[in-house]
Amino acid sequence: MAIGMSELKKGLKIELGGVPYRIVEYQHVKPGKGAAFVRAKIKSFLDGKVIEKTFHAGDKCEEPNLVEKTMQYLYHDGDAYQFMDIESYEQIALSDSQVGEASKWMLDGMQVQVLLYNDKAISVDVPQVVALKIVETAPNFKGDTSSASKKPATLETGAVVQVPFHVLEGEIIKVNTETEEYLEKVK
Protein backbone atom coordinates (compact mmCIF):
# COMPACT_ATOMS: atom_id res chain seq x y z
CA MET A 1 0.00 0.00 0.00
CA ALA A 2 1.38 3.41 -0.98
CA ILE A 3 1.89 6.08 1.67
CA GLY A 4 1.47 9.72 0.62
CA MET A 5 3.57 12.67 1.77
CA SER A 6 0.73 14.03 3.93
CA GLU A 7 0.61 10.78 5.93
CA LEU A 8 4.25 10.92 7.08
CA LYS A 9 4.78 11.22 10.84
CA LYS A 10 7.34 10.32 13.50
CA GLY A 11 7.52 6.56 14.12
CA LEU A 12 5.90 5.61 10.79
CA LYS A 13 7.51 2.64 9.03
CA ILE A 14 8.19 3.02 5.29
CA GLU A 15 10.09 1.17 2.57
CA LEU A 16 12.38 2.91 0.07
CA GLY A 17 14.42 1.00 -2.50
CA GLY A 18 13.64 -2.33 -0.84
CA VAL A 19 14.91 -1.18 2.58
CA PRO A 20 12.60 -0.71 5.59
CA TYR A 21 12.96 2.57 7.52
CA ARG A 22 11.41 4.27 10.54
CA ILE A 23 10.81 8.04 10.47
CA VAL A 24 12.81 9.47 13.36
CA GLU A 25 12.12 13.16 12.73
CA TYR A 26 10.16 15.10 10.18
CA GLN A 27 9.42 18.70 9.30
CA HIS A 28 6.68 19.95 6.99
CA VAL A 29 8.08 22.91 5.00
CA LYS A 30 5.96 25.46 3.11
CA PRO A 31 8.34 27.78 1.25
CA GLY A 32 7.21 31.21 0.07
CA LYS A 33 7.58 30.07 -3.52
CA GLY A 34 7.12 26.57 -4.80
CA ALA A 35 5.37 23.49 -3.51
CA ALA A 36 5.39 22.25 0.08
CA PHE A 37 7.65 19.35 0.98
CA VAL A 38 8.59 17.18 3.95
CA ARG A 39 12.17 16.90 5.18
CA ALA A 40 12.61 13.72 7.22
CA LYS A 41 15.34 11.82 9.03
CA ILE A 42 14.81 8.11 8.51
CA LYS A 43 16.59 5.21 10.22
CA SER A 44 17.23 1.92 8.44
CA PHE A 45 16.04 -1.17 10.29
CA LEU A 46 18.74 -3.24 8.56
CA ASP A 47 21.93 -1.33 9.40
CA GLY A 48 20.78 1.38 11.82
CA LYS A 49 22.04 4.26 9.65
CA VAL A 50 20.12 7.54 9.75
CA ILE A 51 19.76 9.48 6.51
CA GLU A 52 17.96 12.68 5.58
CA LYS A 53 15.35 12.44 2.83
CA THR A 54 13.15 15.07 1.20
CA PHE A 55 9.65 14.10 0.07
CA HIS A 56 7.86 16.36 -2.42
CA ALA A 57 4.11 16.69 -3.04
CA GLY A 58 2.92 13.65 -4.94
CA ASP A 59 5.80 11.43 -3.77
CA LYS A 60 4.73 8.02 -2.53
CA CYS A 61 6.56 5.35 -0.59
CA GLU A 62 5.57 1.78 0.16
CA GLU A 63 4.50 0.26 3.44
CA PRO A 64 7.10 -2.41 4.32
CA ASN A 65 6.23 -6.07 4.85
CA LEU A 66 6.72 -5.85 8.62
CA VAL A 67 5.14 -8.13 11.20
CA GLU A 68 5.19 -7.41 14.94
CA LYS A 69 5.38 -10.46 17.18
CA THR A 70 5.07 -10.50 20.95
CA MET A 71 8.11 -12.23 22.40
CA GLN A 72 9.64 -12.68 25.82
CA TYR A 73 13.12 -11.31 26.49
CA LEU A 74 15.13 -14.12 28.08
CA TYR A 75 18.72 -12.93 28.64
CA HIS A 76 21.81 -11.23 27.20
CA ASP A 77 24.76 -13.56 26.59
CA GLY A 78 27.60 -11.20 25.72
CA ASP A 79 27.05 -10.43 22.06
CA ALA A 80 23.39 -11.39 21.56
CA TYR A 81 20.00 -10.89 23.15
CA GLN A 82 17.85 -14.02 23.37
CA PHE A 83 14.07 -13.87 22.82
CA MET A 84 11.35 -16.53 22.83
CA ASP A 85 8.14 -16.54 20.80
CA ILE A 86 5.40 -16.88 23.44
CA GLU A 87 3.20 -18.94 21.10
CA SER A 88 5.63 -21.39 19.45
CA TYR A 89 8.41 -21.25 22.12
CA GLU A 90 10.92 -20.80 19.28
CA GLN A 91 14.00 -18.83 20.34
CA ILE A 92 15.84 -16.18 18.32
CA ALA A 93 18.94 -14.08 18.92
CA LEU A 94 19.36 -10.39 18.05
CA SER A 95 22.59 -8.41 18.00
CA ASP A 96 23.37 -5.28 20.03
CA SER A 97 22.80 -3.10 16.97
CA GLN A 98 19.40 -4.69 16.26
CA VAL A 99 18.19 -4.19 19.85
CA GLY A 100 19.71 -0.71 20.12
CA GLU A 101 18.37 1.71 22.74
CA ALA A 102 15.64 -0.74 23.78
CA SER A 103 18.25 -2.71 25.76
CA LYS A 104 18.38 -0.16 28.57
CA TRP A 105 14.70 -0.78 29.39
CA MET A 106 14.58 -4.61 29.10
CA LEU A 107 14.35 -6.94 32.10
CA ASP A 108 14.58 -10.73 31.91
CA GLY A 109 11.07 -12.11 31.32
CA MET A 110 9.67 -8.85 29.88
CA GLN A 111 7.33 -9.06 26.91
CA VAL A 112 8.46 -6.96 23.94
CA GLN A 113 7.46 -6.50 20.30
CA VAL A 114 9.99 -7.99 17.87
CA LEU A 115 9.73 -6.61 14.35
CA LEU A 116 10.09 -9.15 11.53
CA TYR A 117 10.90 -8.12 7.95
CA ASN A 118 10.41 -10.93 5.42
CA ASP A 119 10.34 -13.39 8.37
CA LYS A 120 13.70 -12.14 9.73
CA ALA A 121 13.91 -10.39 13.13
CA ILE A 122 15.31 -6.88 12.67
CA SER A 123 14.30 -4.74 15.65
CA VAL A 124 12.79 -4.66 19.15
CA ASP A 125 10.21 -2.27 20.60
CA VAL A 126 9.71 -2.09 24.37
CA PRO A 127 6.46 -0.89 25.97
CA GLN A 128 6.13 2.92 26.08
CA VAL A 129 5.88 2.81 29.90
CA VAL A 130 7.93 0.42 32.06
CA ALA A 131 8.15 -0.03 35.84
CA LEU A 132 11.73 -0.40 37.10
CA LYS A 133 13.45 -0.43 40.49
CA ILE A 134 15.93 2.29 41.48
CA VAL A 135 19.22 0.67 42.52
CA GLU A 136 21.21 3.83 43.16
CA THR A 137 20.37 7.49 43.82
CA ALA A 138 21.47 10.28 46.13
CA PRO A 139 19.75 10.39 49.54
CA ASN A 140 17.22 13.08 50.44
CA PHE A 141 18.32 16.11 52.40
CA LYS A 142 16.09 18.25 54.58
CA GLY A 143 14.98 21.22 52.54
CA ASP A 144 14.94 19.43 49.17
CA THR A 145 11.30 20.27 48.56
CA SER A 146 11.42 22.08 45.24
CA SER A 147 9.37 20.07 42.78
CA ALA A 148 11.47 21.42 39.89
CA SER A 149 14.69 19.94 41.30
CA LYS A 150 15.80 16.54 40.06
CA LYS A 151 18.56 14.06 40.80
CA PRO A 152 19.97 11.18 38.73
CA ALA A 153 18.78 7.66 39.54
CA THR A 154 20.26 4.42 38.18
CA LEU A 155 17.65 1.78 37.40
CA GLU A 156 18.00 -2.01 37.64
CA THR A 157 18.64 -2.21 33.88
CA GLY A 158 21.50 0.30 34.07
CA ALA A 159 19.53 3.20 32.57
CA VAL A 160 19.87 6.58 34.29
CA VAL A 161 16.88 8.93 34.57
CA GLN A 162 16.24 12.20 36.39
CA VAL A 163 13.82 11.81 39.31
CA PRO A 164 12.37 14.22 41.92
CA PHE A 165 14.21 14.45 45.25
CA HIS A 166 11.44 12.62 47.17
CA VAL A 167 12.10 9.39 45.22
CA LEU A 168 14.36 6.99 47.13
CA GLU A 169 16.66 4.07 46.37
CA GLY A 170 14.76 0.75 46.30
CA GLU A 171 11.50 2.28 45.07
CA ILE A 172 9.84 1.21 41.83
CA ILE A 173 9.03 3.96 39.35
CA LYS A 174 7.31 4.24 35.98
CA VAL A 175 9.41 5.64 33.13
CA ASN A 176 8.41 6.74 29.62
CA THR A 177 10.85 4.83 27.37
CA GLU A 178 10.48 7.27 24.45
CA THR A 179 11.24 10.47 26.38
CA GLU A 180 13.30 8.73 29.12
CA GLU A 181 11.36 10.71 31.73
CA TYR A 182 10.17 9.77 35.21
CA LEU A 183 6.37 9.50 35.32
CA GLU A 184 5.43 8.40 38.84
CA LYS A 185 6.11 6.02 41.71
CA VAL A 186 4.45 2.61 41.51
CA LYS A 187 1.99 2.29 44.39
UniProtKB/Swiss-Prot annotation:
SMART domains: EFP (SM01185), Elong-fact-P_C (SM00841). Keywords: Cytoplasm, Elongation factor, Protein biosynthesis. GO terms for biological process: peptide biosynthetic process. GO terms for molecular function: translation elongation factor activity. Pathway: Protein biosynthesis; polypeptide chain elongation. Pfam families: EFP (PF01132), EFP_N (PF08207), Elong-fact-P_C (PF09285). InterPro entries: Elong-fact-P_C, NA-bd_OB-fold, Rib_uL2_dom2, Transl_elong_fac_P/YeiP, Transl_elong_KOW-like, Transl_elong_P/YeiP_cen, Transl_elong_P/YeiP_CS, Transl_elongation_fac_P. GO terms for cellular component: cytoplasm. Its main location: cytoplasm. It comes from the Bacteria. It is found in: Cytoplasm. SUPFAM superfamilies: Nucleic acid-binding proteins (SSF50249), Translation proteins SH3-like domain (SSF50104). Involved in peptide bond synthesis. Stimulates efficient translation and peptide-bond synthesis on native or reconstituted 70S ribosomes in vitro. Probably functions indirectly by altering the affinity of the ribosome for aminoacyl-tRNA, thus increasing their reactivity as acceptors for peptidyl transferase. NCBIfam families: efp (TIGR00038), PRK00529.1 (NF001810). Belongs to the elongation factor P family. This is Elongation factor P.
